[in-house]
């Protein structure tokens, strides 16, 4: 979880009741401050202190409700897995930043799809069928509770316009009540603002959430200025650091564009190629295809990975082309759980990242990676939704040209071997991504019978017709089509903003290399170990003064900078990270200030940093402090 809780995905811009105080009239709260205050207000409705933990699903559900959310069971299960023992306030802020409050317009739009007469009402029979058969199915008892609401039901119909108004009013009142409770409790007020006294004429504090994996927040004891200026930071005396180390690196403009990758003479070399894709999940995690590579004999190899160019409509944005890519090559050893890192594609020539070297015969794992500095959740709202289907004069349904163009792009992405056809194996990766299910042999046989195929593989036209059939099955309702598009990384304008397709090329001098897609899963676990190993092999290491077991490693790859924290002690430690003095930089956390918890005898990736604008000089300046 690395998204900014102060982003547009926050609780909204409702001004807290504290804005009536003299201090806040003079110094209006920023959007991030409003978000943080709303988070605290909701949390402190359930707990006495934000240092307490959420220890059950029920507590999480209640806290989200008090924050103006209406979480489904699916949403709760996403954040409270079988492995979850507790969630802290930091986790709660991150969840709220990702779970946007439902707007009235969104509610109305959803209900309108069931409003066959376009009169603002839905028959109880239709509503009951929809609520018990679709999505997260409701019980009959739950449906009856909705139908029996006196103010919004009459004559066998459900008035969804009144319901939406009631829903929004209730949600706003819930949040307002929590804020009033926070305002009324001066003790909680002092806890929120640390040592900063109410009514101070100098400036308003900006409590800044600092989320990250394995974080224990201590925001109750520390606040920061809204501009992130350390000279104005309001640090309470309860926040103490035992020791600190700092790193400063100045990178010249275009330094990361210089060609450090030299392509060998590939005239007589043999090549294998495969495509793949990074997909950004709702929680900020990245999922991608992963591969096995077989080398028949010892040979010099040239491996590259780069974003995949798709045939685009003129004028359409291609944000994924600027996403950084890398490929880590691992080999199994005596301990299958600990494969050996052989190399990774750290050299660059424009958008291509590559590696040249010799490898022995054998089977290798190829794990793609992206830092997360460029591939981020889209925050800019889409003003106009693209049309996916339309009916002609005869009433026959067809796909719009814009949607057909997008489906053609998706076809290129899922055609992993690049032969212009979709095999059952390739189609299953697509199905797993969009529906979570596989297509068995019998279903594939039916698919081949009904849609255009060649050599038992689906053609581009067959892929189009498959989605047209889906639209017809839903009588033109594009809901399922949008689920597919969102799963593949497209927004409502049919722009690919939350995925990055890529292509891998493997050249071998002495044999024919082979590559096979074996998984599509989260880029974590083995990848994090590989990244840590690559940094440890060549980093600038600094030991925390007086704490020789705590080491910060920073590695400059020209294109990006990676830092990891090594904890050799027998106790967990909390490290506070401050990037505020960095210039023209963006990191994968999305925040300048955050804290991480490092488990005993472990090493973890702290952050990746890249230039915001590659045409300008960028300065990496970071202070790592051990929290007392």
UniProtKB/Swiss-Prot annotation:
Entry annotated with the keyword Repeat: yes
- Polar residues compositional bias: what residue ranges? 1-22, 222-231
The protein's matches in Gene3D superfamilies, at most eight in alphabetical order, are given as:
EF-hand
Per the UniProt record, the lineage of the source organism begins with: Eukaryota, Metazoa, Chordata, Craniata, Vertebrata
Write out the entry's keywords from A to Z: Calcium, Cell membrane, Cell projection, Membrane, Metal-binding, Phosphoprotein, Repeat
Give the originating organism.
Answer: Mus musculus
Q: Which Pfam families match?
A: EF-hand_5, EF-hand_7
- Localization terms from the record: Cell projection, Cilium membrane
Principal subcellular localisation of the protein: membrane
A single cellular component GO annotation: ciliary membrane
This chain's function reads: Component of the EvC complex that positively regulates ciliary Hedgehog (Hh) signaling. Required for the localization of the EVC2:EVC subcomplex at the base of primary cilia.
Q: What is the protein's name according to its record?
A: EF-hand calcium-binding domain-containing protein 7
Q: Give the record's subunit note.
A: Component of the EvC complex composed of EFCAB7, IQCE, EVC2 and EVC; built from two subcomplexes, EVC2:EVC and EFCAB7:IQCE. Interacts (via EF-hand 1 and 2) with IQCE (via N-terminus); this interaction anchors the EVC-EVC2 complex in a signaling microdomain at the base of cilia and stimulates the Hedgehog (Hh) pathway. Interacts with EVC2 (via N-terminal end). Interacts with EVC.
**Chain ranges passing through the membrane:** none
């Amino acid at each position: 979880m690395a998204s900014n809780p102060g982003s547009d995905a926050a609780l909204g811009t409702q001004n807290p009741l504290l804005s009536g105080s003299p201090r806040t009239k003079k110094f209006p709260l920023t959007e991030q401050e409003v978000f943080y205050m709303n988070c605290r207000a909701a949390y402190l409705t359930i707990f006495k202190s934000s240092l307490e933990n959420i220890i059950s699903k029920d507590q999480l559900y209640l806290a989200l409700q008090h924050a103006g959310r209406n979480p489904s069971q699916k949403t709760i299960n996403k954040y409270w897995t079988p492995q979850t023992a507790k969630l802290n306030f930091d986790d709660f802020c991150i969840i709220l930043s990702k779970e946007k409050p439902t707007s009235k317009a969104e509610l109305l739009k959803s209900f309108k799809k069931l409003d066959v007469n376009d009169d603002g009402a839905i028959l109880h029979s239709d509503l009951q069928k929809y609520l018990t058969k679709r999505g997260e199915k409701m019980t009959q008892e739950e449906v009856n509770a909705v139908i029996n609401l006196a103010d919004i039901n009459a004559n066998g119909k459900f008035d969804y316009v009144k319901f939406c108004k009631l829903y929004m009013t209730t949600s706003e009142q819930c949040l307002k009540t929590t804020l009033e409770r926070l305002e009324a409790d001066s003790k909680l007020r002092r806890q929120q603002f640390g040592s900063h006294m109410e009514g101070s004429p100098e400036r308003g504090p900006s409590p800044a959430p600092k989320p990250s994996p394995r974080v224990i927040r201590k925001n109750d004891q520390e606040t920061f200025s809204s501009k992130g200026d350390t000279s104005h930071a309001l640090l309470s005396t309860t926040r103490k650091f035992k020791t600190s180390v700092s790193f400063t690196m100045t990178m010249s403009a275009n330094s990361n564009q210089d060609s450090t990758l030299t392509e060998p003479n590939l005239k007589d070399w043999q090549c294998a190629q495969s495509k793949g894709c990074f997909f950004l999940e709702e929680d900020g995690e990245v999922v991608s295809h992963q591969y096995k590579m077989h080398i028949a004999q010892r040979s010099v190899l040239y491996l590259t990975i780069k974003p995949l160019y798709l045939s685009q409509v003129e004028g359409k944005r291609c944000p994924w082309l600027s996403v950084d890519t890398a490929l880590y090559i691992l080999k199994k050893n005596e301990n299958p759980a600990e494969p050996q890192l052989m190399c990774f594609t750290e050299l660059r020539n424009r958008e291509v990242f590559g590696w040249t070297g010799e490898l022995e015969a054998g089977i290798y794992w190829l794990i793609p990676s992206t830092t997360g500095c460029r591939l981020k959740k889209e925050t800019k709202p889409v003003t106009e939704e693209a049309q996916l289907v339309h009916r002609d004069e005869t009433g026959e349904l067809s796909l719009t040209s814009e949607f057909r163009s997008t489906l053609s792009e998706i076809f290129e992405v899922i055609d992993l071997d690049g032969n212009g056809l979709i095999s059952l194996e390739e189609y299953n990766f697509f199905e797993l991504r969009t529906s979570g299910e596989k297509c068995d042999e019998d279903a594939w046989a039916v698919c081949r019978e009904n849609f255009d195929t060649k050599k038992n593989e689906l053609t581009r036209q067959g892929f189009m017709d498959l989605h047209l059939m889906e639209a017809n099955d839903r009588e033109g309702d594009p809901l399922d089509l949008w689920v597919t598009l969102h799963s593949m990384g497209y927004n409502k304008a049919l722009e690919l903003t939350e995925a990055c397709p890529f292509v891998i090329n493997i050249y071998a001098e002495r044999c024919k290399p082979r590559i096979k897609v074996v998984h599509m899963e989260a880029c974590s676990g083995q990848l994090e170990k590989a990244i840590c190993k690559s940094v440890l092999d060549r980093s600038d290491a600094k030991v925390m003064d007086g704490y020789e077991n705590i080491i910060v490693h920073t590695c400059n790859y020209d294109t990006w900078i990676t830092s990891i924290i090594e904890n050799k002690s027998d106790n967990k430690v909390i490290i506070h990270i401050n990037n505020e003095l960095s210039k023209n930089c963006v990191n994968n956390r999305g925040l300048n200030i955050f804290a991480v918890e490092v488990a005993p005898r472990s090493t973890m990736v702290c952050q990746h940093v890249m230039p915001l604008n590659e045409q300008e000089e960028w300065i990496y300046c970071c202070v790592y402090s051990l929290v007392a």
